[in-house]
C-alpha cells in the first residue's frame, strides 16, 4: 500500500521513525548515514537494534556468552533506545511507552497519542492453543505466557488426571507438582475459583484458578493452632507427628537418634528435648563429630590424663561425657565418627563408665545421649560398612525424622516472621518485622537446599537491605530465589513431548488421510509428516 492510500490510517506501536526524542534522532541519523537518506526505518529495525544493544552490553559487562548469565543480568534493567527507555521485567517481557500514530502523505506517522509511561506486556489467552496439539504452542502458552508471571494457579492435566504442569501458585495452593495425580477433592476445591478451563479433543485439560478475595496464592497456615514442643513450632502434620514422639522421648532417659538434612534444625530439636526433660537443670553439651580431626575426637569425648600424649595439658582434661554428667550429650554428625572409635563409644553407652586416654580408672557417668546425622545409617551399615550396626541399634531407641524445609512450606511464614522479630530486637528496634505477600510467595516457592539455616541467612540479608522499608519485598531477596520460578523442569518438557506423540498417533488412527489428521491436529501436512519422522511413528498406525 502506497503512502497515498495509507494516509489517514492509524497504527499502534512503541516506535515510529518520526518520534522526536534525542535517542531516536541519533538513531535515524546513523541509519541514514549508513544506508542512505531514502531509508525508511521500521519498528522491526529499531527493535532489532535495541535488542542487539542490550545483549552486547550484557556480554561486555559479563565477559561471557552464557545464556543464563545474560538473562539474569538483563532482568529488571532499564535501557535507553530509539523508542525511549525499555525495561526488561523479571517475567522476561518488556515494558515501554506505547504510542498511536496517524500515517501522513510523506509515509511517516504523526504521533497522536502517547502513554507517557511504560506499559508492561500482558499476554492474552487464545482459544486455539491447547487444541493445536503442537508442542511449541503448548509450551509457549503454559510456561512462558501464563506459568510463572501470574499469581493465579495454572494446571495442565492429561486424560488420566496426571499433572503435566503446575506453576508455583498451583503448588502453593494444592501442594501438587508435575507427575502427581490430581485428587477429586482437589479438583472440587479449584472448581469454585476457576477463571478458565480448556479441554482439547484428546483430553488435555487446562485449569487457571485463583482463591477468592486473596492476593498472591500462598501456602496458608491451617486454621488450627500450631503444634508446639518447647521452642519448636509447626503447622506441618508430618513434623507434628515426629514432635509428639520427641515429647514422649523427652520424659525418659532413652537414647534418641535425630535424622535430617543439613541445616534442618537437628541441634535445636536436641536442645528442646533436653529443656523439656527432667535433666533440664543439667548441662547440655554438644560435639560435632564431623568438625573435629579424627585424632582429636577420642580426647574430646573421653578426656585424657597428664602425659597421655605430646601436648597433653598438665593435670589432664575431662571429656565431653564427664562435662555432660547429669545432663545431655548431643553428638552431631554421628555418621562421620571414625569406625575404630565407635567401639569405645558403644562400650561407654553400655557400661555408663568412661576411661580417659592414658588412664585405667573407670569414671561413672550419668548422661543421656542424643545423636544426629544427615546420613542414611542403614545404608552405611549395609553397603559401606562404615557404621557399626550394634552402635546404631544402641542409639536408635527413639528415631525422629525432621522433614526438609521444602516439605514444610506452611512453616516458612512463621519461621520468617520469627527471624525478623529476632533481628528487630538484635538491632535495637531498627528494621521491619513485616513480610510482603509477594516476597513470601517467592520464599515458599524456593527449594531450600540449605533448609532453615539458609532461610535464616536469607531473612537476615533481606532485613538489612530493607532496614528503612516498611516491609520485605522481592527485590530484597537473593537473585536465585527471585528467579527460582523461571527454571523449567526437564521432565515437564518430556511429558509434553509424550502427549504430543500420543495425540498424533490417535489422530492418525481416527483419520483416513494425512491431510485429515493434520487438520484435526491444527498443523500443516508437512509439519505432521516431519513429526511422524521425528517420533518414528510406524505407518501401520495410520489406518
Curated annotation (Swiss-Prot):
Binding residue positions for ATP: 260-267, 324-333
Q: For this protein, what is any one GO molecular function term?
A: sequence-specific DNA binding
Report the Gene3D superfamilies cross-referenced here.
1.10.8.60, 3.40.50.2300, Homeodomain-like (1.10.10.60), P-loop containing nucleotide triphosphate hydrolases (3.40.50.300), PAS domain (3.30.450.20)
InterPro entries annotated for this entry?
AAA+_ATPase, Homeodomain-like_sf, HTH_Fis, P-loop_NTPase, PAS, Peripla_BP_I, Sigma_54_int, Sigma_54_int_dom_ATP-bd_1
EC assignment: the record states 1.14.14.51, 1.14.14.52, 1.1.1.243, 1.1.1.144
This enzyme catalyses: (4S)-limonene + reduced [NADPH--hemoprotein reductase] + O2 = (1S,5R)-carveol + oxidized [NADPH--hemoprotein reductase] + H2O + H(+); (4S)-limonene + reduced [NADPH--hemoprotein reductase] + O2 = (4S)-perillyl alcohol + oxidized [NADPH--hemoprotein reductase] + H2O + H(+); perillyl alcohol + NAD(+) = perillyl aldehyde + NADH + H(+); (1S,5R)-carveol + NADP(+) = (R)-carvone + NADPH + H(+)
Q: How does activity depend on temperature?
A: Optimum temperature is 45 degrees Celsius.
Q: Which SMART domains match?
A: AAA
Q: How is activity influenced by pH?
A: Optimum pH is 7.7.
Q: Where is the Sigma-54 factor interaction domain?
A: 232-464
> What is the protein name stated in its UniProt record?
Limonene hydroxylase
Amino acid at each position: 500500500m502506497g503512502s497515498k492510500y495509507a494516509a489517514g490510517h492509524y497504527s499502534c506501536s512503541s516506535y515510529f521513525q518520526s518520534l522526536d526524542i534525542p535517542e531516536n534522532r541519533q538513531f535515524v541519523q546513523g541509519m541514514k548515514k549508513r544506508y542512505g537518506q531514502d531509508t525508511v526505518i521500521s519498528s522491526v529495525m529499531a527493535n532489532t537494534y535495541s535488542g542487539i544493544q542490550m545483549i552486547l552490553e550484557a556480554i561486555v559487562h559479563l565477559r561471557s556468552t552464557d545464556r543464563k548469565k545474560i538473562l539474569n543480568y538483563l532482568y529488571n534493567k532499564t535501557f535507553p533506545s530509539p523508542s525511549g527507555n525499555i525495561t526488561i521485567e523479571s517475567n522476561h517481557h518488556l515494558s515501554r511507552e506505547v504510542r498511536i500514530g496517524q500515517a501522513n502523505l510523506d509515509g511517516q506517522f504523526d504521533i497522536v497519542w502517547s502513554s507517557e509511561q511504560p506499559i508492561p506486556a500482558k499476554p492474552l489467552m487464545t482459544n486455539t492453543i491447547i487444541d493445536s496439539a503442537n508442542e511449541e504452542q503448548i509450551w509457549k502458552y503454559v510456561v512462558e505466557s501464563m506459568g510463572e508471571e501470574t499469581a493465579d494457579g495454572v494446571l495442565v492435566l492429561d486424560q488420566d488426571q496426571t499433572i503435566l504442569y503446575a506453576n508455583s501458585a498451583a503448588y502453593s495452593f494444592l501442594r501438587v507438582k508435575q507427575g502427581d495425580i490430581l485428587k477429586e477433592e482437589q479438583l472440587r476445591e479449584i472448581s469454585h475459583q476457576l477463571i478458565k478451563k480448556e479441554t482439547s479433543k484428546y483430553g488435555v485439560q487446562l485449569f487457571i484458578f485463583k482463591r477468592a478475595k486473596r492476593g498472591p496464592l500462598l501456602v496458608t497456615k491451617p486454621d488450627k493452632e500450631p503444634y508446639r514442643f518447647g521452642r519448636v513450632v509447626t503447622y506441618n502434620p508430618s513434623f507434628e507427628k515426629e514432635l509428639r514422639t520427641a515429647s514422649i522421648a523427652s520424659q525418659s532417659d532413652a537414647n534418641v537418634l535425630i535424622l535430617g538434612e543439613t541445616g534442618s534444625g537437628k541441634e535445636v530439636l536436641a536442645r528442646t528435648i533436653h529443656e523439656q526433660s527432667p535433666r533440664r537443670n543439667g548441662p547440655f553439651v554438644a560435639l560435632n563429630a564431623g568438625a573435629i580431626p579424627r585424632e582429636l575426637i577420642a580426647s574430646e569425648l573421653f578426656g585424657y590424663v597428664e602425659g597421655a600424649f605430646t601436648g597433653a595439658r598438665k593435670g589432664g582434661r575431662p571429656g565431653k561425657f564427664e562435662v555432660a554428667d547429669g545432663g545431655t550429650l548431643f553428638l552431631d554428625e554421628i555418621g562421620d565418627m571414625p569406625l575404630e572409635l565407635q567401639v569405645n563409644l558403644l562400650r561407654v553407652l553400655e557400661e555408663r563408665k568412661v576411661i580417659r586416654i592414658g588412664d585405667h580408672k573407670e569414671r561413672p557417668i550419668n548422661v543421656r545421649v542424643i545423636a544426629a546425622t544427615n546420613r542414611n545409617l542403614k545404608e552405611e551399615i549395609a553397603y559401606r560398612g562404615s557404621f557399626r550396626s550394634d552402635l546404631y541399634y544402641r542409639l536408635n531407641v527413639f528415631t525422629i525424622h525432621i522433614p526438609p524445609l521444602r516439605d514444610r512450606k506452611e512453616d516458612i511464614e512463621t519461621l520468617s516472621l520469627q527471624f525478623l522479630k529476632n533481628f528487630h530486637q538484635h538491632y535495637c528496634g531498627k528494621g521491619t518485622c513485616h513480610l510482603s505477600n509477594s516476597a513470601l510467595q517467592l520464599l515458599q516457592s524456593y527449594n531450600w537446599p540449605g533448609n532453615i539455616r539458609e532461610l535464616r541467612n536469607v531473612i537476615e540479608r533481606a532485613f538489612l537491605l530493607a532496614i528503612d522499608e516498611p516491609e520485605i519485598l522481592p527485590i530484597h531477596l537473593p537473585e536465585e530465589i527471585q528467579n527460582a520460578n523461571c527454571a523449567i523442569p526437564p521432565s515437564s518438557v518430556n511429558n509434553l513431548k509424550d502427549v504430543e506423540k500420543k495425540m498424533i498417533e490417535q489422530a492418525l488412527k481416527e483419520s483416513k488421510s494425512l491431510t485429515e489428521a493434520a487438520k484435526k491436529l491444527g498443523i500443516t501436512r508437512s509439519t505432521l509428516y516431519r513429526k511422524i519422522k521425528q517420533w518414528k511413528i510406524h505407518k501401520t498406525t495410520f489406518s
